[in-house]
Amino acid sequence: MKYDIIGDIHGCLQEFQNLTEKLGYNWSSGLPVHPDQRKLAFVGDITDRGPHSLRMIEIVWELVIHKKVAYYAPGNHCNKLYRFFLGRNVTIAHGLETTVAEYEALPSHKQNMIKEKFITLYEQSPLYHVLDEKRLLVCHAGIRQDYIGRQDKKVQTFVLYGDITGEKHADGSPVRRDWAKEYKGTTWIVYGHTPVKEPRFVNHTVNIDTGAVFGGKLTGLRYPEMETVSVPSSLPFVPEKFRPIS
């Protein structure tokens, strides 16, 4: 099986359409379909900050849950939106406010439909996907080699948030260790979460979050070809979001 793994979309629907078309997908049915049956895989954070978060929920739900032709691994923004939909006490900030504003503008029956679709998508998706006979792993923020196969709380925190130190940058964002430099496995780990200006290959890992929502690019990785394909963002460039990994 061949896969096209898509970086953090964050509600950037137009960029997602442009990227999938560049990857050879046809949208005539209203969904991206590849003539050679390649499958899409998402590294999470499909919502927040960008203009079309709810439409991205509908598309990914349709592909992953209804048609079962794609893979989705939730990100930290997905986790927070899930908790919001469950009625938990979450801070509506750091991008969630844009998704909530879209949601609250809907009539109640459409709100219920979106909520049910996202809860189903989140609950029926694993923390990470191990594909191609363990040669490929798709997740949100990365995973240590000794965590593969585990689903416990420590692994969940790592997969959703990365290798956080507990310290904070001046803007309040967490300081993260560069776990990829220590990775010695042969399974390719494809992930996102931390915006980089260009796809970052380190050992058998690839970070494909090229900051579409911050004016960078939306990137896909063609597997097993290991080729990256990108399209430019239509949004303003925010240079401070592309911080070097410490």
Curated annotation (Swiss-Prot):
Coiled-coil positions: none
Gene: prpE
The organism's taxonomic lineage, starting at the top: Bacteria, Bacillati, Bacillota, Bacilli, Bacillales
Organism annotation: Bacillus cereus (strain ZK / E33L)
Keywords: GTP-binding, Hydrolase, Nickel, Nucleotide-binding
E.C. code: 3.6.1.17
Entry cofactors: Ni(2+)
SUPFAM superfamilies given in the database record: Metallo-dependent phosphatases (SSF56300)
Designated name of the protein: Bis(5'-nucleosyl)-tetraphosphatase PrpE [asymmetrical]
Primary role: Asymmetrically hydrolyzes Ap4p to yield AMP and ATP.
An annotated Gene Ontology molecular function: bis(5'-nucleosyl)-tetraphosphatase (asymmetrical) activity
Matches recorded under Gene3D superfamilies: 3.60.21.10
Top-rank lineage group of the source organism: Bacteria
HAMAP family xrefs: PrpE
TM regions (residue ranges): none
Recorded family membership: Belongs to the PrpE family.
Catalytic activity: P(1),P(4)-bis(5'-guanosyl) tetraphosphate + H2O = GMP + GTP + 2 H(+)
